[in-house]
C-alpha cells in the first residue's frame, strides 16, 4: 500500500508504506519525526530468513534502542541479510546482521546505504552520496528545493561502467542491471522514490 499514516499493532502512529502480505514496511516515520528504514543485503544466494524484515522499521520506532539491539542480537540468524537504520533529530543508529560488529551509532554527516553494509563503496552509492551531499549543502534550509533536486538524482537509471562493478555473486549481467540508482526492468526494479526531511523542530516533509 502507498505511504500514508496508519497505526501499528503496538499502537504506534507511523507514516509508511505497507506490505499487504506481511504487514511490514521498508521506511517509516513516527509523529516525533524519528525515521527508520531497512534494506536487504544482496548475497547471491536464496534467502532463508524465517522472520520478515519488514517488521524491523516498525519495531525501531516502538522499542527503546537497548531493547531493539538485544532483540536483533538474539534473532539475527532468523532474518535474511538486512541493514536497519534508525534516525532521530539528535543522532542515528545502524545495525546489520551481516556486520562483524553490529549495532553502531551514526554521527552527523552524509552517508550512503545500498544492499550491502553502510558506506560500502559501490559506484552508485559513491555517486549518489557525493551528489546528495552537495545538493543538501546548496539547498540550505529550503526543504522544497531539496526535495525537488534530490528526486532526479535518485531516479538516475544510468548503469555503472563494468570495470567498477562489485562482485556479489549474481553474475556480470545482473551486476550491470543492478548498478544504477534507479533500476528499471520488466520483472524487477525500483518501485518508489522517497525523500524525507525532518527539521530540528521535528517538522516532517
PLM features: residue spans?
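N-terminal nucleophile
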Residues: 1-205
Amino acid at each position: 500500500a502507498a505511504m500514508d499514516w496508519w497505526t501499528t499493532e503496538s499502537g504506534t502512529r507511523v507514516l509508511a508504506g505497507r506490505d499487504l502480505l506481511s504487514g511490514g514496511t521498508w521506511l517509516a516515520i513516527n509523529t516525533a519525526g524519528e525515521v527508520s528504514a531497512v534494506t536487504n543485503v544482496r548475497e547471491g544466494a536464496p534467502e532463508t530468513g524465517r522472520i520478515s524484515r519488514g517488521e524491523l522499521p516498525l519495531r525501531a520506532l516502538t522499542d527503546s534502542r537497548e531493547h531493539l539491539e538485544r532483540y536483533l542480537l538474539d534473532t539475527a540468524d532468523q532474518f535474511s541479510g538486512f541493514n536497519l537504520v534508525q534516525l532521530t533529530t539528535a543522532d542515528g543508529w545502524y545495525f546489520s546482521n551481516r556486520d562483524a560488529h553490529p549495532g553502531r551509532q551514526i554521527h552527523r554527516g552524509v552517508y550512503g546505504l545500498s544492499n550491502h553494509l553502510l558506506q560500502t563503496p559501490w559506484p552508485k552509492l559513491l555517486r549518489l552520496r557525493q551528489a546528495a551531499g552537495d545538493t543538501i549543502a546548496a539547498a540550505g534550509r529550503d526543504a522544497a528545493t531539496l526535495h525537488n533536486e534530490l528526486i532526479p538524482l535518485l531516479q538516475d537509471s544510468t548503469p555503472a561502467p563494468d570495470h567498477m562493478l562489485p562482485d556479489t555473486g549474481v553474475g556480470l549481467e545482473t551486476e550491470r542491471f543492478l548498478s544504477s540508482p534507479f533500476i528499471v526492468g520488466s520483472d524487477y526494479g525500483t518501485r518508489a522514490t522517497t525523500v524525507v526531511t525532518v527539521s530540528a523542530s521535528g517538522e516532517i516533509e
